[in-house]
Amino acid sequence: VTGSHHPQGYLCLKLRMGDGSTANQDVIEELEDTMAPEPIGIEGRYRTADIIPDYMQAVASFVDAEAIRAAHLRVVVDPMGGAAQGYLADLLRELGVEVHEIHAGQASGQEEICPDPVEPWVDACERTVVEDGACAGLVTDGDADRIGAVDERGRYIHPHQIMALVLG
């Protein structure tokens, strides 16, 4: 259940497949066909599992950890009060990056920001990167499925431009 980058109060069910991709229309229709028109009360059991350590290890395996450590980076991370709070910053710290995390430890909306990694909501990250002398800033949306960035001069890099950088 997520509101993604929308203001508080907007929630929906966002279905992802096992590989992280969006469900295709056939899967959505099959799911809709099994749903009751009205909520039903079902009691049952559940169990919790701490999947974070394995997930973080998997994410870290995609990068050259030694090169990151050797670079002695300083980065600003802005999870915008959303789902990435603590996780992205902790992952970068484990890779030897000096991290200043802003807009963490609170629900998005406390500072009247929209958890969307686009202008003007990235202004605080832009300022903090320059003030801290950081080499970059990373900004995630509310459910951490999109990312924006800021360069060392405080200039915004749109999520669509990041894909071009990754592919280049």
Positions of the model-derived regions?
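Acidic, glycine-rich loop-and-beta core segments that form the ion-binding/anion-interacting portion
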Residues: C114-G168
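Active-site microenvironments of hydrolase-like enzyme catalytic domains
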Residues: V1-G18, T140-R153
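Gly/Ser/Thr-enriched, mixed-charge loops and adjacent short helices
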Residues: L11-D132
